[in-house]
Amino acid sequence: MTEQTQDENKLIAERRAKLEHIRTNCPANGHPNNFDRKHKAADIQAEFGHNTKEELEGMGIERSIAGRVMAKRGPFLVIQDVSGRIQAYAGKDVQKDLKEKFQGLDIGDIIGVTGQLHLSGKGDLYVNMEEYQLLTKALRPLPEKFHGLTDQETRYRQRYVDLIVNEQSREAFIMRSKVVSAIRNFMVKKEFMEVETPMMHSIPGGASARPFATHHNALDIAMYLRIAPELYLKRLVVGGFERVFEINRNFRNEGLSPRHNPEFTMMEFYMAYADFNDLMDLTEEMLSSIATELCGSPQLPYGEHTVDFGGPYARLSMLDAIKKYNPDNATIQSMTYEEVKDVEFMRDLAKSLGMTVEKFWTCGQLLEEIFGETAETQLMQPTFITGYPADISPLARRNDDNHFITDRFEFFIGGREVANGFSELNDAEDQDRRFKAQVDAKDAGDDEAMFYDADYITALEHGLPPTAGQGIGIDRLVMLFTNTHTIRDVILFPAMRPQAN
């Protein structure tokens, strides 16, 4: 047992003894639930922060606040609520009463205070403790040695402590909530209908990913947590709902990284009588609008860069992007789609770049892997990458002029993918062939290849109008709006490896 652990255990024991004293001597003060908190710290600061000491004395303003004790400075307590901080003043008689009733207050305790509002000699607002209650006795001490938590693992495992002591974390999740609300409002104004589709699928589909598997006992069938809502949302477009969107969780049984969490939030939407160009235009409008609304400017700091959401955003094909970021590679500079279709040529090119090549990779997969290896991380500013090969886009419509590629894009900011969209494949027979090709790929060892979904084919046979659809990764987008560089900083309770003990 470390010295730090011994000290913490001693403090916990002392606080438990105080709680026992409270229960024995003041039963009503064990865990009371009758305090009426009428005011928040930030509202008080905003309303009266400009008043002088004399003005406040003459006004006789009474306020009722409640929150967590974050610091003790002589007779002053710093109380934190959801909106911010304000001080409370405990005179000598109050301090004596607190000592008798509660054996004093500890940092972390939650209290309610009612009293007159005053201004301290240093110019800080405070509430005089005329009426007060200990609402919750904190048995564990808050981190004291640093300004908040510095151990990342502890921050993620004990997010509740992180939120108490780290203002930056609180602000990040407040911004996350605002981003989601702004997206929802934008979509509703564009006449999209919000819907909810199943979270458990009998056939996982809508993306190339490894699913989480479970079993439905009552139905006695295998079920999968959804990897994407796409096929259900497009069924709704078949049914006549021409503009739909959903903000919800997806689950993919894959690795953890600074940009990957197995449980993540996606906003996915579909619009009839539109194509992938309309999606790109809508995305520009949405993100420029949201950045300006929430941050006051479309230019946001991100690390050493400034991301400009104002638009217009760059648009270039995957092949052109590879050429742009490999200017000194003669083979790449002269490469055409005819060569991209040659799997042996692509294998040799990938190996020449030092890449490990999987035996089941197709021409399209090889092109995408080369793009990811040499170009993706260079895309700091908002950029649409188009021209995705059909063999890695089984749900996207083929391009009219070049059937090797599809009318699909992925949207990159900060060197990572944020969104994926395309003109939807609405040819039932072509979709049938592509599903079968995915099954062949799965049999060849690609465990991220899609399953065959016969009911979705049936839906397409009823007729899907020309449609475009897109998914936006909420977590990665919030990372940009909060200037954070790991996805776990914007997910309240991220997936974590089990602790050794």
Swiss-Prot record:
UniProt keyword terms in alphabetical order: Aminoacyl-tRNA synthetase, ATP-binding, Cytoplasm, Ligase, Magnesium, Metal-binding, Nucleotide-binding, Protein biosynthesis
UniProt subunit comment: Homodimer.
Main location: cytoplasm
Protein name: Lysine--tRNA ligase
Subcellular location: Cytoplasm
Native source species: Shewanella halifaxensis (strain HAW-EB4)
Cofactor dependence: Mg(2+)
Protein's UniProt keywords contain Protein transport: no
